[in-house]
Amino acid sequence: MGKYFGTDGVRGEANLELTPELAFKLGRFGGYVLSQHETEAPKVFVGRDTRISGEMLESALVAGLLSVGIHVYKLGVLATPAVAYLVETEGASAGVMIXASHNPALDNGIKFFGGDGFKLDDEKEAEIEALLDAEEDTLPXPSAEGLGILVDYPEGLRKYEGYLVSTGTPLDGMKVALDTANGAASTSARQIFADLGAQLTVIGETPDGLNINLNVGSTHPEALQEVVKESGSAIGLAFDGDSDRLIAVDENGDIVDGDKIMYIIGKYLSEKGQLAQNTIVTTVMSNLGFHKALNREGINKAVTAVGDRYVVEEMRKSGYNLGGEQSGHVILMDYNTTGDGQLSAVQLTKIMKETGKSLSELAAEVTIYPQKLVNIRVENVMKEKAMEVPAIKAIIEKMEEEMAGNGRILVRPSGTEPLLRVMAEAPTTEEVDYYVDTITDVVRAEIGID
């Protein structure tokens, strides 16, 4: 990743790290890079989530885009995947989303989509970063007739809602509980599921700029679990702040995570002959129980590094149409170019309706193994070399031998911090504790700085 761009755009604490000045430059330089080969006046869609800093950053970003002659279509508050969908289907030059996913309200981010609806590749990000770091801004500064035009485009949200409804099936009064995380889905999820005919209970639908993801949403599903049980709902659907993730809750109040959601959708598509190459793309963090369930069904898997960016890269490279992460990013490439929590939710309820099975029945086919993750502080220079340390290598091999195939160990460096992550999965919590504690003791003794 670069100096400004991380794995999911530019992020930081709003007004301190991600300032209006930086947002203006990102609009100006990013817009220029993404539209310099356009033969007609370029058009860029801009959306945001509900953070209090969103309008401030949007104003600065839009000014930057307009300053290089780009026509800006302001979408207002809507889901990140809605921007990707609209860019691809309406022939825009690019899209920009101002959001910070599941992060707290003080953070914000700016994420670009190319004209194909996909997140920017490393080369385009490097071009933008080079302009940001240049000593002088040498980009054109057009006079009045060359400036961009600003257009409010609320109908973009309605088009996205209509599209998601078109991919579903009538729910005929199914009781559905929604948690929109006081975020981007608060403008659309209720409408989508009402149009599908669901009987709704909704929480996390009163954003005030500061309460996005605050004890609600996909990272805090506890409130939704209670609401599902109290309302007698058949399913609960929790989105994150920008609605690119989904965590579900079954009728008993139990969590159905991204691994289980991918399995349910993957099995459904496989049985219909619609799962490309009969393969699901997942990351190294997916649970062993998920892998065992896929093996039992004869479904193949491709495994990538952690991050939906890497999942999408593998899907595009190899022609797969389903992938995702345990955290709830699910990419359905036949429908959209990026993870889409509300799309995943529509597909999940469709599968329940078509199969006549409850969510707990569908999810029961995946037995999630207990998992434990411990972070150990190490010198940055050592985190990449940990697996070369003889004692560490030996203890991992010893633990894997003891597991005899009925468990999994993953030791990997953090991509952003001076940490070595030690993760284990096994049939019981006692076994998991034993494996992780044994390995971490050796790692700390050899290279730890705690």
Swiss-Prot record:
Q: What class of enzyme is it?
A: isomerase
- So what EC number does this one have? 5.4.2.10
GO cellular component entries: cytosol
Residue ranges spanning the membrane: these are: none
Instruction: Tell me the active site.
Output: S101
Q: Does the keyword Metal-binding apply?
A: yes
Phosphoserine-modified residues are where?
S101
Keywords from the UniProt entry: Isomerase, Magnesium, Metal-binding, Phosphoprotein
**Which molecular function terms from Gene Ontology are attached?**
magnesium ion binding; phosphoglucosamine mutase activity; phosphomannomutase activity
Description of post-translational modifications: Activated by phosphorylation.
- Give the domain of life: Bacteria
**Reaction(s) this enzyme catalyzes, per UniProt:** alpha-D-glucosamine 1-phosphate = D-glucosamine 6-phosphate
Q: Does the keyword Transmembrane helix apply?
A: no
Q: Give the GO terms filed under biological process for this record.
A: carbohydrate metabolic process; peptidoglycan biosynthetic process; UDP-N-acetylglucosamine biosynthetic process
Bound how, and how many: what does the cofactor note say? Binds 1 Mg(2+) ion per subunit.
Could you say which residues bind Mg(2+) here? S101, D240, D242, D244
Family listed: Belongs to the phosphohexose mutase family.
Report the protein's function: Catalyzes the conversion of glucosamine-6-phosphate to glucosamine-1-phosphate.
- Its name, as the record gives it, is Phosphoglucosamine mutase
